[in-house]
Amino acid sequence: MKICLIDETGAGDGALSVLAARWGLEHDEDNLMALVLTPEHLELRKRDEPKLGGIFVDFVGGAMAHRRKFGGGRGEAVAKAVGIKGDYLPDVVDATAGLGRDAFVLASVGCRVRMLERNPVVAALLDDGLARGYADAEIGGWLQERLQLIHASSLTALSDITPRPQVVCLDPMFPHKQKSALVKKEMRVFQSLVGPDLDADGLLEPARLLATKRVVVKRPDYAPPLANVATPNAVVTKGHRFDIYAGTPV
């Protein structure tokens, strides 16, 4: 995949070249999207909109730390949707990991989560965030046990995953309504890189075959159900809903 690669570390140790080789990235000076290695982290920038800033994965500080410490925990919509109750903490595959937020929430309340991400740039950002998270004194121990990354396309990888999880989560990129200059800066940068998941409808069936208990699909409130398969079961929040489908028992 082509992207502009920028090293701002000043270390001169070739770390960016190693990273590019690992994720199959090719430097393209004219690309509007840039993957930047800073002294602190790896980040994604949209070069024609510098005001948007850089997007990076941070499990240790910022919004994620706040959500972990002060968020709803088991009361969060995604936790309710996967069916966490009492001692039941399902094994989860997050088949469209994105920046790992929902996966991290589930891991922080005790679920073991395997994240799948097919876009190599997003996978590189996740991997960088995980490495820093694993090294953190406060959360590193449980994070290593509960949150892992698999760089693979969900469409091909879902049939190969063992052991089967109890729950599969899907959150395909859906085109945002035009009116939203409100669309978060992050979404704008992200959509420029990834675009809408045009093949997302093909994920529902393999996800249902893989999950032993249920599939949870996160949708904007205005979006139709995935693959136009309606379900009466959903956890509804402001702006989103988590549609719930039966999996395939062992």
Curated annotation (Swiss-Prot):
<keyword id="KW-0698">rRNA processing</keyword>
<keyword id="KW-0489">Methyltransferase</keyword>
<keyword id="KW-0808">Transferase</keyword>
<feature type="binding site">
    <location>
        <begin position="153"/>
        <end position="154"/>
    </location>
    <ligand>
        <name>S-adenosyl-L-methionine</name>
    </ligand>
</feature>
<dbReference type="GO" id="GO:0005737">
    <property type="term" value="C:cytoplasm"/>
</dbReference>
<dbReference type="GO" id="GO:0008990">
    <property type="term" value="F:rRNA (guanine-N2-)-methyltransferase activity"/>
</dbReference>
<protein>
    <recommendedName>
        <fullName>Ribosomal RNA small subunit methyltransferase J</fullName>
        <ecNumber>2.1.1.242</ecNumber>
    </recommendedName>
</protein>
<dbReference type="InterPro" id="IPR007536">
    <property type="entry name" value="16SrRNA_methylTrfase_J"/>
</dbReference>
<comment type="function">
    <text>Specifically methylates the guanosine in position 1516 of 16S rRNA.</text>
</comment>
<keyword id="KW-0963">Cytoplasm</keyword>
<feature type="binding site">
    <location>
        <position position="171"/>
    </location>
    <ligand>
        <name>S-adenosyl-L-methionine</name>
    </ligand>
</feature>
<feature type="binding site">
    <location>
        <begin position="117"/>
        <end position="118"/>
    </location>
    <ligand>
        <name>S-adenosyl-L-methionine</name>
    </ligand>
</feature>
<feature type="binding site">
    <location>
        <begin position="101"/>
        <end position="102"/>
    </location>
    <ligand>
        <name>S-adenosyl-L-methionine</name>
    </ligand>
</feature>
<comment type="similarity">
    <text>Belongs to the methyltransferase superfamily. RsmJ family.</text>
</comment>
<dbReference type="Pfam" id="PF04445">
    <property type="entry name" value="SAM_MT"/>
</dbReference>
<keyword id="KW-0949">S-adenosyl-L-methionine</keyword>
<dbReference type="InterPro" id="IPR029063">
    <property type="entry name" value="SAM-dependent_MTases_sf"/>
</dbReference>
